[in-house]
């Protein structure tokens, strides 16, 4: 796993109130205290901002906002992973598991819940 992702994951984990994160001093700790809905709302906002940045980049040819908004989406997705005691490595492992499998085949192999 990238050292940057590893360090960021560790910082996010340290912001959990159970690990001493203070919601008065830490944005991430505040998200953890507010719970799943607050984190999911933020992910929805960031996903929308990424979509809009990508549309704007097609017109302006300026990709910097796409990068910025994608970083925000990744960050908040990492907060959600931590909320469920998952890590970026878990995502990388899942991607590796899917490697070489067509998307159609992978989707068909899922069991209905």
Curated annotation (Swiss-Prot):
Q: Which GO terms describe its biological process?
A: L-histidine biosynthetic process
Q: Which InterPro entries match?
A: HisE, PRib-ATP_PPHydrolase-like
* Pathway annotation: Amino-acid biosynthesis; L-histidine biosynthesis; L-histidine from 5-phospho-alpha-D-ribose 1-diphosphate: step 2/9
Q: Can you quote a single GO CC term?
A: cytoplasm
EC class name: hydrolase
Quote the EC number.
Answer: 3.6.1.31
Q: Which Pfam families match?
A: PRA-PH (PF01503)
One function term, GO molecular function aspect: ATP binding
Q: What is this protein called?
A: Phosphoribosyl-ATP pyrophosphatase
Output the HAMAP family linked to this UniProt entry: HisE (MF_01020)
Q: Which UniProt keywords apply?
A: Amino-acid biosynthesis, ATP-binding, Cytoplasm, Histidine biosynthesis, Hydrolase, Nucleotide-binding
Query: Family per UniProt?
Result: Belongs to the PRA-PH family.
The reaction(s) this protein catalyses: 1-(5-phospho-beta-D-ribosyl)-ATP + H2O = 1-(5-phospho-beta-D-ribosyl)-5'-AMP + diphosphate + H(+)
**Annotated gene:** hisE
Localization, UniProt: Cytoplasm
